[in-house]
């Protein structure tokens, strides 16, 4: 059988692409080296932030707004346990923060619902938070967090119900191109398609070693917290920048545990076995202490944690482009630790590519050619 589309990597983007392409009537094969959702990539750990007024650059705002619409649609499949939780997101940092300036600019350009608070205003609204006098907060009322593993599980199930073929626990070992399309090699045999999407995450260079993607080991952890830090008490998700420039992110507490991670830093790795479990690097358990001690002093001890990986591009912007010399193969990689919130729209972009539809978005900033 020759498929319309083969998807290599069925984590966040691949799961979405499988669903949207199958829903569009295409004959699709989803593949993954493991059984998604799983612990081997960048999507585990239950939750991911979604921010609309994007501090990483205005070019992302149209994408994230479309992503939000798609997340809202997907959430309707799980109304008892919603995939998207509109908790709000407070972005904290020094008044002269470049990141916060970008958040403010994105909000102004796109007329987003963002409220600016000074230090006293932040601490009055959320007494659990402490910030210096020179800090400001930009509160995104309409943002919140996503249940990442539930989202992937839902997409995979919906795709399967719609007739999508799924080949999991079966790594793709090679990709070949010829006049007939794309052929993938796996332990289960060879499969052909007219087009392919490569969204293999951290270890995409095992297939395409020429790509400028660097895996980085990252950790996040859950700390003891009480009901004051919960969504029920209107405690928001957050990003926070310390005076030294370190960037943190976190979520409202659930079951008396608050999850937090550090966005910058981490350990550069070159193979999967270098991504050692949480606590095997001496700094893992204390990485969030500078933020917790200064900004959330009421949070207790570290309960448990996990390791994941970022697939970093050189400039930490996404790579969304066809494989050089092969216009029938789309790459979506280099998501650099801020990609999950876009998984829905990136999956839709992939499905449009498979149908020969022109994207509604300007993807020029994400081309591979910027690194040449």
From Swiss-Prot:
Its cofactor is FAD. Optimum pH is 8.0. The modification S-8alpha-FAD cysteine is found at residue 308. GO terms for molecular function: flavin adenine dinucleotide binding; N-methyl-L-amino-acid oxidase activity; sarcosine oxidase activity. FAD binds at residues 4-34. GO terms for biological process: DNA damage response. Keywords: FAD, Flavoprotein, Oxidoreductase. InterPro entries: FAD-dep_OxRdtase, FAD/NAD-bd_sf, Me_Trp_Oxase_MTOX, MTOX. It is an enzyme of class 1 (oxidoreductase). It comes from the Bacteria. This is N-methyl-L-tryptophan oxidase. The gene is solA.
